[in-house]
Amino acid sequence: MTNKYRNQKVVTPHGTFDSKREYRRYQELMLLQRAGKISELRRQVKYELLPSQRLNGKCVERPLYYIADFVYTQDGETVVEDVKGYRDPASAGYAKYVIKRKLMLYRYGIRVREVG
């Protein structure tokens, strides 16, 4: 099955990954964790960027989330990674990602690390 970015999903004993590239990165991070270079490796971590908006007690806008591919601790710092393949600045999907990346920095003080 392909997703919106035409990547092939990868099903493994460790779970389902959005692409082969993402699964390879997961394997690399697992090796780094076993070697003690990183710790607390997590996948698909959800961050709320904007809460739901209410007007007269009714929800008029749902919350906005960013889902990080990987989150881990390295040298006492939280690292958030997003695995990126081809980047098309003209695409709507990439534009949404850039906005969410900027909101992560603004709201949480975390700069998303893009890996390819």
Label every PLM stretch briefly:
Residues 1-116:
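Electrostatic, structured charged patches in enzyme active sites and in nucleic-acid/phosphate-binding
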